[in-house]
A protein has these predicted regions:
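Structured segments of extracytoplasmic/periplasmic soluble domains
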Residues: 47-54, 76-77, 178, 188, ...
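Substrate-binding/catalytic groove segments of enzymes
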Residues: 54-59, 79-84, 324-326, 355-359
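Long, compositionally biased
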Residues: 94-117
Length: 372
């Protein structure tokens, strides 16, 4: 009798489990799991990465921008149709932009679900958050370029990270300018070690004062090294180069007494090679001040109402034209000319490509813009 009872009990449990399993199966069929828009974008990116791992011959060979259809991922059975991924998938469209820059590939999912959700670039978000002004602090516009000026507090971006006390901590940057849908950022921290701009023997000076020719300098090598070792203070510092645009740097020369009104002399000459990292220029620093007495790079008034003003020393890549060794550097609240063989910090600049997309934040130091 006890065996019969035990047998019936086991049978009941098995039957219950089968019914439960069948119910879960029916539930999954009639109530499929849907994802958020952000989760869907991540799924599309992962499916695209797998697609090209399986089809490496399909990767673009030349630098540029390319498109991949969402349907190609569905046909490869790497992702479900959009109406099975998103609850409103029938009203959405999706595509993938592939960007090749040197040896780096970027995969950018683009979702369009009308008013409900559309993948948004960081540039669009910044311009939506900031009305262009013509006085005081804020976002200015000149000849198609947007730039921040004054004591602004909403132009912070978190990009890259390092580990501190077993916690992932983001690097903070300030937005300097926006041009051609690309965003120039300046790091709020230095790279962790001082470098000389150039220490070669200068035959013109008969001493090891270095030369102020950027294309043949040592600082260009230091900037290039940042591509593999971004920060010497943190060994595990990470920067995603696929989000950046390699650019020819503005290396035109100017004099300490050249007035701000002369404009961006630095960009009249560009570096021979393209770089992912650069430095701020004296013109950009002067332009960021709203003090009317900021008339040239040596004006102490330039530190007033200027979000780019520092308390640390830093190199620029800008040289003077009146000698073969002088370099602009920021120190003691002003720009001065130093010999190239001097050791100073680098606060690097980068350019986010037009494919940097908004992923959260309001631009404050407490809640900086996030990108993906």
């Amino acid at each position: 009798m006890e065996k019969k009872t035990l047998f019936m009990l086991c049978g009941s449990v098995i039957a219950f489990l089968l019914i439960l399993l069948f119910g879960v199966l029916l539930l999954s069929i009639f109530n499929p799991k849907y994802y958020t828009y952000e989760q869907a974008e991540q799924l599309i990116k992962e499916a695209t990465e797998e697609y090209y791992q399986l089809n490496p011959a399909g990767l673009p060979v030349d630098d540029g921008k390319y498109n991949l259809s969402y349907e190609a991922l569905v046909q490869a059975e790497l992702i479900k149709p959009l109406n099975e991924v998103l609850e409103d998938g029938d009203t959405c469209s999706a595509s993938i932009t592939i960007v090749k820059q040197e040896s780096i590939y970027s995969y950018i999912p683009i979702l369009n679900c009308g008013d409900a959700y559309t993948t948004r670039s960081l540039v669009d978000k910044i311009l939506a958050d900031n009305q262009v002004v013509t006085q005081d602090s804020g976002l200015y516009q000149d000849n198609g370029e947007y730039y921040f000026k004054g004591k602004v507090s909403n132009n912070y971006v978190a990009f890259g990270s390092y580990e501190k006390k077993n916690k992932e901590t983001p690097f903070l940057w300030r937005i300097v300018s926006i041009k051609d849908n690309e965003i120039k950022l300046k790091a709020m921290s230095n790279i962790g070690t001082k470098v000389t701009w150039d220490s070669r023997y200068n035959s013109n000076e008969n001493k090891e004062s270095g030369y102020n020719d950027f294309d043949y300098s040592e600082i260009k090598d230091a900037l290039r090294d940042l591509e593999t070792t971004f920060n010497h203070r943190y060994e595990n510092a990470q920067i995603d180069l696929s989000k950046l645009k390699a650019s020819n740097l503005c290396i035109g020369k100017r004099e300490l007494s050249d007035p701000l009104s002369k404009g961006n002399l630095e960009c009249t000459v560009l570096s021979k090679d393209k770089y992912f990292f650069g430095t701020i220029t004296p013109y950009e620093y002067m332009r960021a001040s709203t003090d009317k007495d900021c008339v040239n790079a040596s004006s102490l008034a330039c530190q007033n109402y200027n979000y780019l003003a520092l308390t640390d020393s830093e190199w620029t890549i800008t040289a003077v034209g009146s000698n073969s060794y002088g370099i602009f550097a920021y120190d003691d609240d002003e720009y001065e000319i130093y010999k190239a063989n001097t050791a100073k910090h680098i606060f690097p600049t980068i350019t986010l490509s037009e494919f940097a997309y908004y992923n959260g934040g309001n631009g404050t130091a407490e809640d900086p813009y996030l990108i993906r």
